[in-house]
Amino acid sequence: MEILGTKYELIKNDHGLIEANIDGECKTYAKVIRIRPLQDMLYGEATEDERKKRYSEVMRHEVIHAFFNESGLSDYSNNEELVDWLAMQFPKMLKVFQELGCTE
């Protein structure tokens, strides 16, 4: 995938992240985004829908890190609260933008 003209490798179903106890990561210098397997998202009694929602949220989260880094905004990329907020709110924002016809 390309993030602002820079190629990133996307590694889905990375079992190594389970051992590290993280759902995903964006390796800025290596230009790699890694995501843990869908079936290993969340713990306990999580439903398949909950796991899919978390998987998508983690994917957005890591891509946002990459966008901030490629924009020269590494301080924003290091702000997990901001990155989480954008990852969680983006689908809602996109829906409004689409309704308004302002996605171009």
Residue ranges and their predicted role:
Residues M1-K53, A66-E70, S74-Q89:
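Active-site scaffold of zinc-dependent metalloenzymes
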Residues R54-E62:
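Short alpha-helical catalytic segment bearing the HExxH-like zincin motif
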Residues Q89-V96:
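Short, basic alpha-helical nucleic acid-contact segments in DNA-binding proteins
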Residues Q98-E104:
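Long, well-structured alpha-helical subdomains associated
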